[in-house]
Regions:
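Helix-adjacent hinge/juxtasegments
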Residues: 63-82
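Vicinal oxygen chelate
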Residues: 2, 45, 79, 88-135
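Short, conserved charged micro-motifs
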Residues: 18-20, 83-88
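N-terminal beta-strand motif that seeds the catalytic metal site of vicinal oxygen chelate
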Residues: 1-18, 26, 74-76, 132-135
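A short, acidic/glycine-rich surface segment
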Residues: 32-33, 60-65, 105-112
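Exposed loop/turn and edge beta-strand positions of beta-sandwich/beta-sheet ligand-binding modules
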Residues: 5, 40-42, 72, 115
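Active-site/binding-pocket entry motifs
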Residues: 52-53, 61, 97, 104
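Core segments of cupin and vicinal oxygen chelate
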Residues: 11-58
Length: 135
């Protein structure tokens, strides 16, 4: 038996509405948005393949969360299936500024041996976002 992946991570936000709109513009699916809006769910999540980011909206309290987690504390690397140019266009079309890259990076695939290039940006809470493109 072994740990084989990440099911979800969690991050707090200072402005849930702004975060939902930002990630929707980038093409992500927001899970449980309607339930969160109606008050039947305390959180919503951003779906990424078979994993998700649970978003803790402002005012959310739970006993099982990072005790020092604050909006902007998260660093996430997404995998982009396409070219660097296509990723740059997607970000530009979504109004997202690339703050660094493209540049060569060491990703996780094949224990860091696959060549990759990445681009960096920030979301509305100032979380660091990276898009990894395996070449």
């Amino acid at each position: 038996m072994a740990t084989v992946g990440i099911d979800h991570i969690a991050m707090p936000t200072a402005n849930a509405e702004r975060l939902i709109q930002f990630y929707k513009k980038l093409g992500f699916t927001i899970n449980d948005e309607a339930e969160w809006r109606s008050g039947t769910a305390n959180i919503f999540s951003i779906q990424i393949g078979d994993s998700k980011i649970n978003v803790h909206p402002e005012g959310y309290t739970a006993s099982y969360k990072g005790p020092t987690a604050v909006p902007g504390c998260t660093d996430i690397c997404f995998v982009w299936e396409g070219s660097v140019e296509e990723c740059q266009k997607m970000l530009s079309d979504s109004g997202v500024e690339v703050i660094r890259g493209p540049g060569a990076r060491k990703g996780a695939r094949k224990n860091g041996t696959l060549p990759a290039v990445s681009l960096y940006a920030r979301d509305p809470d100032e979380n660091l976002l990276e898009w990894m493109i395996y070449t």
